[in-house]
């Protein structure tokens, strides 16, 4: 399935916030790869919001991001992080297509993936995403298992990094001897590690998941489509 391997690991992180710098460094250190879902219409350090726990969350400026995310995948997260089902079809199309075009121009790579802002979507949103050239899009509905998605445009992750059972799921994944392809798909927001003061949790996750010869480590696009 993946260069002859039956297991794969991938990561998906949203919003292009300053904490991505530390996360990317950690991922590179452990030899894993992921996909970063960006809002091109909001990609500025001046774009800041206050988390309910009091931390100020900043997106990064666009300068230097191509170098930062080198070796990882860039995917769309909509132009302005719009809650897509609340809008008309023209607005939905603009949110997706303009974000896709902007990101392709900035990063010099095709953008075929997306993560739905707020995790919200409906049939109209899915159909428009497909028409815009999006081949997969992540939701926030966890599966708690390792099967490949039947419909990539409503892709459900294995779990979030803060889920209580994440370590147990990793152990199950590593121990699995299934003949079927097994995918461990983790998602989140890197600012959550500052909010929850638990960067050590991600360190432990990466230590457990990395360095296994029988596992393919790839971006979302690589594990889904082999490209």
Question: Positions of the model-derived regions?
Answer:
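Active-site metal-binding loops of divalent metal-dependent hydrolases
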Residues: 13-16, 78, 190, 220
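Hydrophobic "anchor" residues on beta-strands that sit immediately upstream
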Residues: 10-11, 73, 215
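Metal-dependent polysaccharide deacetylase catalytic core of the NodB/CE4 family, i.e.
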Residues: 28-125, 131-135, 142-155, 182-193
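Non-membrane alpha-helical structural segments and their capping/turn regions in soluble enzymes
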Residues: 89-94, 164-167, 196-199, 203
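A short acidic, amphipathic alpha-helical/loop segment
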Residues: 22-26, 124-128, 201, 205
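Short beta->alpha connector loops
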Residues: 15-18, 117-121, 161
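Boundary/entry segment of secreted carbohydrate-active catalytic domains
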Residues: 1-19
């Amino acid at each position: 399935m993946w260069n002859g391997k039956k297991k794969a690991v991938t990561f998906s992180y949203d919003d292009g916030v300053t904490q991505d710098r530390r996360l990317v460094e950690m991922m590179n250190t452990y030899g894993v790869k992921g996909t970063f879902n960006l809002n091109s219409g909001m990609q500025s350090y001046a774009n800041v919001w206050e988390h309910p726990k009091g931390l100020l969350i900043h997106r990064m400026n666009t300068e230097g991001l191509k170098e930062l995310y080198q070796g990882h995948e860039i995917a769309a997260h909509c132009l302005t992080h719009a809650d897509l089902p609340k809008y008309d079809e023209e607005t939905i199309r603009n949110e997706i297509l303009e974000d896709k075009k902007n990101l392709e121009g900035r990063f010099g790579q095709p953008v075929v993936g997306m993560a739905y802002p707020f995790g919200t979507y409906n049939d109209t949103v899915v159909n428009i995403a497909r028409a815009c050239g999006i081949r997969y899009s992540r939701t926030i509905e966890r599966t708690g298992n390792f099967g490949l998605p039947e419909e990539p445009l409503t892709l459900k992750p294995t779990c979030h990094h803060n889920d209580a059972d994440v370590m147990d799921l990793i152990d199950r994944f590593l121990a699995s001897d299934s003949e079927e392809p097994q995918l461990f798909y983790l998602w989140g927001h890197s600012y959550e590690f500052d909010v929850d003061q638990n960067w050590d949790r991600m360190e432990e996750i990466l230590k457990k998941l990395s360095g296994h010869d029988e596992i393919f480590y790839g971006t979302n696009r690589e594990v889904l489509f082999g490209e």
